[in-house]
From Swiss-Prot:
Bilayer-spanning residue ranges: none
Gene label: rpsQ
Subunit structure: Part of the 30S ribosomal subunit.
Domain of life: Bacteria
Entry keyword annotation includes Ribonucleoprotein: yes
One cellular component (GO) term of this entry: cytosolic small ribosomal subunit
Protein name: Small ribosomal subunit protein uS17
């Protein structure tokens, strides 16, 4: 029996902090319907991700994938940079 390819969770978000060495904080936003009132509410989550080459800058839109735990709070890795932030 062949090994089944494992599905990897990926998310897309915006880099809000790149001050750490080889790490970035990514803000993931999603819209959820309120259970009682039915209005759509924006919810967000901040996730720490591993950036091996320190190539991300604040404001970049990136894709991250779930991986094994790399530290106490970091278990996501950078897959690719979708869009670079404009530098003024």
């Amino acid at each position: 029996m062949a090994e089944a390819e494992k599905l990897v969770r990926t998310l897309t978000g915006k880099v809000v902090s790149d001050k750490m060495d080889k790490s970035v904080v990514v803000l993931i936003e999603r819209r959820v319907k309120h259970p009682v009132y039915g209005k759509y509410v924006s919810k967000s989550t901040k996730i720490k991700a591993h950036d091996e080459n320190n190539e991300c800058n604040q404001g970049d839109t990136v894709t991250i994938a779930e991986s094994r735990p790399l530290s106490k709070t970091k278990s996501w890795t950078l897959v690719k940079i979708e869009e670079r932030a404009t530098r003024i």
